[in-house]
């Protein structure tokens, strides 16, 4: 069978979904990837893995209706040309316009993967509520013929059911994207205490809270290293260098920019921190667990699934700088807890978040095996 996989961002398609695409191939299917960046940047990389890559016109953050219309027709043209047997879509724009385009071409074997509901589903402001209302309506129309919709956490699944977007029989829960336990192996904790946050630099990921919590930590423990890794972003809530620079100048954090291999930084940290407001299931948390790192994250949809509070890390309230700093300082003062937390995290990754198990479940639900 031909399987089309459509998303908003080529980087995510390759670095976050490659294992799933290879699982499709392993089961005897042809795989075609569609995303935003030019073919000359990605075709060769995908081809080496047995995947055909094509560029489509799609913007992750645009609010322009004309841009969205162009996205719809770009996806429709790609699907009409390919004539796939099944379509997997993820990211909001791809889910809505990919599902609609496929349905209009009488392709009904479409499988949306909800990797998080995005910033509009986070409480805050009339504008977000208005956008959410529009998006809910779009989802209802786009997903009405989908046999299955995948969710990475129970909160997102419940929200879609309560909003009457889909019924619970079609709402399938999977354990995030999973983590490759061979690629991310348990590593010894470092001698010197350090914290690490890996994230796109946007407010909704809790980056500002991390920066301010690090300021409090450094005031009390100036020898502790606080690291930040991740790309700048075009999201409306992006945190730019103008915000970041004072923290760098004052020695609060060390910023390393974007990387395609985070293992080096994971191995350097004692504790991984992600104070996000909402996630699908944060892959960096899973990678930290697999590496054997305690985690401090928020009691938020998607994040809370990754931490058993007090066992492999701690949960803190969303947007609570002081609570975050308190837990960071608590672990600095109680380093004897780290080893057992690290062991529990790796064990949880093996039992719950093994990417092989996650990918097999998706294949079964898509009737590929």
Tell where the protein language model's regions lie, with residue ranges:
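A conserved mid-protein helix/loop that constitutes part of the nucleotide-sugar donor-binding site
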Residues: 14-19, 193, 202-216, 286, ...
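Glycosyltransferase donor-sugar binding loop
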Residues: 33-40, 198, 225-239
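Donor nucleotide-sugar binding/catalytic pocket of nucleotide-sugar-dependent glycosyltransferases
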Residues: 54, 136-185
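Acidic anion/phosphate-binding donor-loop and adjacent secondary structure
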Residues: 63-67, 161-162, 175-193, 260, ...
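Aromatic "clamp/platform" in nucleotide-sugar-dependent glycosyltransferases that forms part
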Residues: 258, 277
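Short hydrophobic beta-strand element within catalytic cores of glycosyltransferases
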Residues: 294-297, 307
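Conserved acidic donor-binding segment of nucleotide-sugar-dependent glycosyltransferases
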Residues: 309-310, 314-321, 330-335
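A short, well-ordered alpha-helix in the C-terminal region of glycosyltransferases
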Residues: 323, 330, 337-352, 358-364
